[in-house]
Amino acid sequence: EKFVMISTDKAVNPTNVMGCSKRIAEIYVQSLARKLSLENKNKKYTSFITTRFGNVLGSNGSVIPRFRKQITDGGPVTVTHPEIIRYFMTIPEACKLVLEAGGMGSGGEIYIFDMGEPVKILDLAKRMIKLSGRTEVKIEFTGLRHGEKLYEELLNVKEQTEMTYHDKIMIANVRQYDYETVKEMITELVNTTQSYDSMKIVGLMKELVPEFISKNSLFEELDHKNEKQEDHKSCGELLDHPSELKRDASSLN
């Protein structure tokens, strides 16, 4: 049997809770797959595979149906930022590639898909207005939402890819995690959700996914605290190694 988890490009260097939750799911699924492969070398077991891609055209909550409704209602068509871009796939493309990745995966892989060139959302809005024939409809910029990026990434800067036999499917080489450690941290996170303390919950998420840096959000203060702790730690390390402190000071002369 195979289990295919659907992830998103928002899991890469996440800037909001949704993207981070997807990255946590990736980490859990991949660490579980690794554990099962080590424990069941000569037995059958469920293979856990992850697929990571961008926006699916026409799916529930996607930008196309929203723009279509706004145009039908006479506008305005709302775009968050004039420079925002996104990767898109059609529903048939997404289904086909997910099934293909599920078929080729043996367990633990994170598959990413070649989605071509990203699309500027403003250009998409203009084209839809033009095709509708309702050129009087205006476009309104509403500003980036909490945790929203101008562009999404399919890979972290530390990640690399391996090619597969399919020219549109690649494997992301990501950091490996110990399953028991991940399980312990996720259990703590789940238990903490019962407190409804959003700062504490997001703080634990940031421990699991250190590259989760909040953007346009009240959770940014957690990142500032982490930066101060890192600075304090670095200072302490230098005091523990005075020769390094002396060397750094001499380099300034």
Task: Give the positions of each predicted feature.
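Conserved Rossmann-fold NAD(P)-dependent oxidoreductase catalytic core, especially the SDR/UDP-sugar
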Residues: 1-26, 31, 37
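Strand-loop microenvironment adjacent to phosphate/nucleotide-handling motifs in alpha/beta enzyme folds
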Residues: 31-253
